């Protein structure tokens, strides 16, 4: 069912003098005094309004515009007034920010300072390690080397000059004063490492039990069989997007082809794009499908606050949302199969406590390069093990932000979408869990999407995914402690969901392998056990790869890359925990617009040629068609002419030099496994620091 008009329909104004031409009305929604939202329902009136605007620009309404009435031109002026008001409001907000320094601005400056502080720490550590290596090389050259210094300390008669005496004093100092703090910190990290490994092992055992007993959510009977009398509920489908011209067409197309009665679902295209040319392309795509009978509306916010959460919150405030029972959310690069709603909606039947049905992600570009292969390992474990086990045994997991269906009542009772963090999906999931709503995960329902193909895009995505949870933990902790849920659920939320899997994992990974291990090379009295460096990490990596057995040849690159990413994750965790500026950053992940199958692109091209142009020629002005074609040509030619360049990441490069320096020092102590681990890990940091993994940025 299309939404009822909340503005004023103007299709009848354009029908006069047009031979009775019919069209779907346009709704210009003025939902706030600053005219912050525009909603277009249907192709005809929007195209006519744009045609009138073009005609005015070309001579005050000569030619076709002579027959238009004053009322028609009034509507054009109203649209222009709306745009002017939006731009004026944006200008006023920008001017206000110039004279008023907000807490977010102060936090952003503090966050940048913290980033420089971490880089300075790594540089200082590197300088000290190079100095220590020079000292050890000089001692080795002079024959002062000791493979195990604690076994023998030279007597006074054995000391050869002041340099040898200084070296012996340095050995005594590090054995008496430096060794103990390093050993204490290493034992603490080893303890955290063992706890996290046990958690990973328990999750894998739970997944094995699910597979063995064939446990999964099931639908009673076949509700869609002929004569079953199934009453299709009203479903709202939301597609939030922002400047994603590479993927908008295929995501809208997939949503419009969902197998559900057309009068029973509505698609909202929530466009937060700042590029007007992209807005025009998305409007044309919406118009194409609307003309084919799909209930689809286009919404654009002039004042884009709150990122994705603000976009979804604005869409849920529409009056017609009260007519819908469920809402399905798909990000701009997701392509649901036509039977998605038939596989998810029936699970709500007879289960009033069920608030969320989450589907699994499947990736169209998982074999594109080494970076996408390594991401696929991580995400396969996340869905196959973490999400599935938590869904079966706890009825709770973190909402993945897309490819899920919410009961609208659950959203409303949990406070709706909040703009306080950049992980609005996890935020609403935690609040719904505290209100007693249950979740289920469907491992056999997969939705196609894309993985970031460049390290820059992946790095920014991981920063948001690891800073947001820590920021959310600060905000949710009082609510968790006072919530009316069982104590074991509170313990699971605090100890496992937040602390162990979001805080401890990046902390010990960075501290143990990037700080303590290099330190022990220059302070050999504090030695890390071999099983911590080699055996247990390899076993844990093997468990991670089990859900994607085809990735087994990449077990060693996966282990090294995860340790490399610990720098980004640790930095993000600190920024979120201490509410620094970078925890508020939201950068849309770069997409490439890859299709799932070869015939998908053929079908899209056929639809564009056979449906878009002929129908748009009837509904859109000639000038707009020319503009659309020019945008299409620029979109196709841009990737060909763009030059790709490598970006240098200073933190990763500095850590690479640090680890390679420590590897050189380990040779003097004849520590074979330590040497090889530090060597390969240092090379891994070097590859990442030089942006040699994944696709280079444009």
UniProtKB/Swiss-Prot annotation:
Entry binding sites for substrate: 331, 333
GO terms under biological process: cell wall organization
Encoding gene, per UniProt annotation: CSLC2
Transmembrane segments: 124-144, 190-210, 503-523, 528-548, 653-668, 673-693
Functional note: Probable beta-1,4-glucan synthase rather involved in the synthesis of the xyloglucan backbone than cellulose. Seems to work simultaneously with xyloglucan 6-xylosyltransferase. Xyloglucan is a noncellulosic polysaccharides of plant cell wall and consists of a glucan backbone substituted by xylose, galactose and fucose.
Documented EC number(s): 2.4.1.-
Active site feature: 272, 425
Protein family (similarity comment): Belongs to the glycosyltransferase 2 family. Plant cellulose synthase-like C subfamily.
Broadest EC class assigned to this enzyme: transferase
Subcellular localization(s) per the UniProt record: Golgi apparatus membrane
Keywords: Cell wall biogenesis/degradation, Glycosyltransferase, Golgi apparatus, Membrane, Transferase, Transmembrane, Transmembrane helix
Membrane topology: Multi-pass membrane protein
Main localization of the protein described in the UniProt heading: Golgi
Protein's recorded name: Probable xyloglucan glycosyltransferase 2
PANTHER family per UniProt: GLUCOMANNAN 4-BETA-MANNOSYLTRANSFERASE 9, XYLOGLUCAN GLYCOSYLTRANSFERASE 2-RELATED
